[in-house]
Swiss-Prot record:
InterPro entries: AB_hydrolase_1 (IPR000073), AB_hydrolase_fold (IPR029058), SHCHC_synthase_MenH (IPR022485). GO terms for molecular function: 2-succinyl-6-hydroxy-2,4-cyclohexadiene-1-carboxylate synthase activity. Changing residue 86 to A: 1400-fold decrease in catalytic activity. Its EC number is 4.2.99.20. Pathway: Quinol/quinone metabolism; 1,4-dihydroxy-2-naphthoate biosynthesis; 1,4-dihydroxy-2-naphthoate from chorismate: step 3/7; Quinol/quinone metabolism; menaquinone biosynthesis. It catalyses: 5-enolpyruvoyl-6-hydroxy-2-succinyl-cyclohex-3-ene-1-carboxylate = (1R,6R)-6-hydroxy-2-succinyl-cyclohexa-2,4-diene-1-carboxylate + pyruvate. PANTHER family: 2-SUCCINYL-5-ENOLPYRUVYL-6-HYDROXY-3-CYCLOHEXENE-1-CARBOXYLATE SYNTHASE (PTHR42916), PROTEIN PHYLLO, CHLOROPLASTIC (PTHR42916:SF1). Catalyzes a proton abstraction reaction that results in 2,5-elimination of pyruvate from 2-succinyl-5-enolpyruvyl-6-hydroxy-3-cyclohexene-1-carboxylate (SEPHCHC) and the formation of 2-succinyl-6-hydroxy-2,4-cyclohexadiene-1-carboxylate (SHCHC). Is also able to catalyze the hydrolysis of the thioester bond in palmitoyl-CoA in vitro. The gene is menH. This is 2-succinyl-6-hydroxy-2,4-cyclohexadiene-1-carboxylate synthase. GO terms for cellular component: cytosol.
Length: 252
């Protein structure tokens, strides 16, 4: 079994760019940014429980990494960058730390490296279980209306929130709930030490208005790019800014 994805082919000899979306997104999420890099072959992946991979369920990050590895092999992708936002960034960091043949580097936008103590994990587990129950039992429009009121999305205006609620409500609540439970921050290990000892290139993007993830970025041994005029979802709020940062990274 492999993950559903959309492949776009570029010039031979350059590494692939493999894009991983955030929670409740899909393979279209990164395309406005990714299509600015037409010289590179691009793979836009649907993570388990999402988009064309909605019917695929996993028990945890190990399963996601295994599916990602098999998907890369199926597309004969031998050299690649992982580019991930939020959940996709966490998947990228986990997979990279577990080892992926052909990995050139990881570019993470607003991805959490992991909670650092049992108290934080227990608190997150309680919170995520409440969201899981809501995704299972309530209309998605109601759930996402509250989801986008969370502090991390404070930079969104009302129109942006309405647009995201409408877009994300096209998902399947049950498969979102399963993926949220399987990849909760409560079950993700703290990756800071692994990332410090990494053998791959590591870059971190965060919006200038995303104070939480700017603080997290400062804890990581990563080259950090702050995206102007953007909050947590920088590639949506300022795609040109993210394109500029990716172009700078890929020139090295």
């Amino acid at each position: 079994m492999i993950l559903h994805a959309q492949a776009k082919h570029g010039k031979p000899g350059l590494p692939w760019l493999v894009f991983l979306h955030g929670f409740s997104g899909d393979c279209h999420e990164w395309q406005e940014v990714g299509e600015a890099f037409a010289d590179y072959s691009r793979l836009y992946v649907d993570l388990p429980g999402h988009g064309g991979s909605a019917a695929i369920s996993v028990d945890g990050f190990d399963d996601v990494t295994d599916l990602l590895r098999k998907t890369l092999v199926s597309y004969n992708i031998l050299d690649f960058w992982l580019v991930g936002y939020s959940l996709g960034g966490r998947v990228a960091m986990m997979a990279a730390c577990q080892g992926l043949a052909g990995l050139c580097g990881v570019i993470v936008e607003g991805g959490h490296p992991g909670l650092q103590n049992a108290e934080q994990r227990a608190e997150r587990q309680r919170s995520d279980r409440q969201w899981v129950q809501r995704f299972l039992t309530e209309p998605l429009t109601a759930v996402f209306a509250d989801w986008y009121q969370q502090p991390v999305f404070a930079s969104l205006n009302d129109d942006q929130r309405r647009e995201l609620v409408a877009l994300r409500s096209n998902n399947n609540g049950a498969t979102l709930a399963a993926m949220l439970e399987a990849t909760s921050l409560a079950v993700q290990p703290d990756l800071r030490a692994n990332l410090s000892a990494r053998t791959f290139a590591f870059y971190y993007l965060c919006g200038e208005r995303d104070s939480k993830f700017r603080a997290l970025a400062a804890e990581l041994a990563a080259d950090c790019h702050v995206i102007p005029r953007a909050g947590h979802n920088a590639h949506r709020e300022n795609p040109a800014g993210v394109i500029a940062s990716l172009a700078q990274i890929l020139r090295f």
